[in-house]
């Protein structure tokens, strides 16, 4: 279910008895991947940590998840194929060699990556990924990095930003890949 302008998104309800409490984006993606691999429905997840939790305004209070104040929201589930290995992700995929040189590519479903507001317009229920492709010089990279905490690194002429339902990218050189971690 994709978010639509002017329509309610989510509802208040306690985490179901079979819901799974997860403390990180890695745990959340693993729970989804495990259910899919077993042919089961994706479980309702109670987020108490991670970038997706922060994006959704989560407080990290596990006890609150079992109360009627808990909010249940549908979020997009994405996949990335890395050299033939398919991985589920809920928050982000980052491809880079170094933060200080070379290409950096990101697909963001969550707004945050740690303390950085990388994708200020990202919404985990809109059916879109916010992708970023950057190869900045050292001076511009340092300036952009200082502005990441507030999300004011954008717009930037050397950072290509797109909002897309799917992305296919061929990287310029071999890069390390981080999936929800």
Please give the residue ranges for each predicted region:
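Internal helical hairpin/lid segments
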Residues: 100-144, 149
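ATP/nucleoside-binding phosphotransfer catalytic cores, i.e., glycine-rich phosphate-binding loops
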Residues: 133-181
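Generic structural hydrophobic/aromatic packing signal, biased to beta-strands
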Residues: 78-80, 105-107, 131, 167-169, ...
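Short low-complexity stretches enriched in small and charged residues
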Residues: 84-94, 121-126, 150-155
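Short secondary-structure boundary/capping segments within folded domains
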Residues: 12-13, 120-122, 158-159
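A short, compositionally biased
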Residues: 69-77, 126, 163-164, 169-174
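Catalytic core of DAGKc-family lipid kinases
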Residues: 1-112, 118
């Amino acid at each position: 279910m994709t978010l639509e302008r002017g329509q309610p998104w989510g509802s208040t309800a306690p985490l179901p008895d079979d819901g799974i409490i997860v403390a990180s984006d890695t745990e959340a993606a693993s729970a989804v991947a495990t259910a899919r691999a077993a042919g089961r429905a994706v479980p309702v997840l109670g987020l108490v940590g991670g970038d997706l939790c922060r994006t959704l305004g989560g407080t990290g209070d596990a006890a609150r998840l079992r109360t009627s104040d808990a909010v249940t929201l549908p979020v997009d589930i994405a996949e990335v194929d890395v050299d033939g290995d398919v991985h589920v992700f809920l928050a982000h995929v980052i491809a880079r060699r170094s933060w200080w040189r070379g290409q950096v590519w990101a697909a963001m479903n969550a707004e945050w990556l740690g303390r950085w507001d990388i994708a200020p317009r990202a919404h985990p229920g809109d059916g879109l990924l916010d992708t970023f492709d950057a190869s900045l010089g050292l001076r511009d990279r340092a300036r952009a990095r200082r502005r990441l905490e507030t999300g004011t690194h954008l717009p930037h002429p050397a950072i290509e930003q797109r909002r897309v339902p799917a992305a296919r990218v061929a990287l310029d050189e071999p890069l390390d890949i981080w999936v929800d971690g």
